[in-house]
A protein has these predicted regions:
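Alpha-helical scaffold/interaction cores of sigma-54-like transcription cofactors
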Residues: 1-330
Length: 330
């Protein structure tokens, strides 16, 4: 994956001079270089084309990658909210929007054509160390998709092995690339939306796209909307948009409370957000060291800390967006 390839990809989708886009691709190249993700994303894009794009739900770090999006491996655009003119490629970022889907209609100031709005502000940080592509498909497509994946890699002289946990509803396919690098495709049977928990009746109206994404987060999460959150919203201590409904909410909260001079990534905010996502503090309790860091050093409001202590699971934001696209709930 050369810089020339990334430049061509940028110009193909966003035109010449889209330096923000090119810079994001360079960052992702640095994070995935030498790993299996790039060939796995090419495979995922081919799989989506072979089985009709809207019958394959892509989850995990793939949704956080602009490179994966431009290759066709995921419909989720991880860039910050922005307008893009499909005619002349004028690109305008909006730092004040919560989500690209909420941007109002805009006519291109250069050529007068209607501009497209996109962008969900997902970070490439999740690509570090990843080697798993997660997919969900309807039950009737599960066996054909698994067979297609084995055949795809066999044609490319790659060894594949089925993981021991595989059964009638999940397949873990470990592949070994010719360079010796390994990755895993995890394919699961997709449960329809009606199998998800319904939204609590006391959740505020979801009148914006961003609120609907937050609502999907609550449906996928466990114990993210309890008395602590309801009380904080009702008393005006925080807006519904600030409720912790996916992993990125926790990370953004910690970064916002970190003094500017200390914001150089040290891994701790991301580690805490992952622990909250997996329900570690709900199961094992929050270590005093972490609680003091949040309370005394970052001065995170108490209601957020209480939320982190009882959340049993948070989805990734990209998975919420992907699920909405899959279900046609944009």
């Amino acid at each position: 994956m050369t810089k020339d390839f990334l430049l061509r990809l940028t110009e193909e989708h966003y035109g010449a001079g889209a330096f923000h886009v090119y810079g994001r691709l360079l960052e992702e190249q640095r994070l995935v270089r030498g790993g299996p993700l790039l060939p796995m994303w090419h495979c995922t894009a081919a799989l989506r084309r072979a089985f009709v794009e809207d019958s394959v739900l892509v989850l995990g770090c793939t949704n956080d990658s602009l490179l994966a999006h431009l290759l066709g491996a995921t419909p989720v655009n991880p860039l910050p909210p922005h307008y893009h003119c499909p005619n002349c490629h004028r690109l305008i970022f909006d730092a004040h929007a919560d989500d690209g889907w909420d941007l109002p209609d805009l006519t291109c100031p250069e050529c007068g054509a209607p501009m497209a709005a996109a962008g969900h502000n997902l970070r490439s940080r999740s690509l570090i160390g990843e080697s798993v592509v997660s997919l969900q498909v309807p039950q009737e497509r599960f066996a054909p998709v698994c067979a297609w994946l084995r055949d795809y890699w066999a044609q490319r002289d790659c060894q594949t092995d089925t993981e021991p946990y595989s059964d009638a509803e999940v397949m873990g396919l470990r592949l070994t690339l010719p360079e010796g690098v390994q990755g895993i495709f995890e394919v699961r049977v997709l449960y329809p939306t009606d199998r998800l928990d319904p939204l609590p009746s006391d959740v505020p109206p979801l009148h914006t796209a961003y609120r609907r994404i937050k609502g999907m987060g609550l449906r996928l999460a466990s114990d993210a909307w309890t008395g602590t959150e309801r009380d904080a919203v009702e008393r005006g201590r925080m807006a519904f948009e600030d409720v912790l409904t996916f992993r990125e909410d926790v990370y953004d909260l910690l970064r916002q409370h970190t003094p500017p001079k200390q914001r150089r990534e040290n891994g701790l905010p991301w580690a805490i957000s992952e622990d909250v996502r997996k329900g570690k503090y709900a199961a094992q309790g929050m270590p005093k060291l972490i609680e003091n860091y949040l309370c005394k050093q970052l001065r995170v409001p108490a209601h957020y800390i209480e939320s982190m202590k009882h959340i049993r699971y948070l989805p990734k934001k990209g998975d919420c967006v992907g699920r909405m696209l899959f279900e046609g709930e944009k």
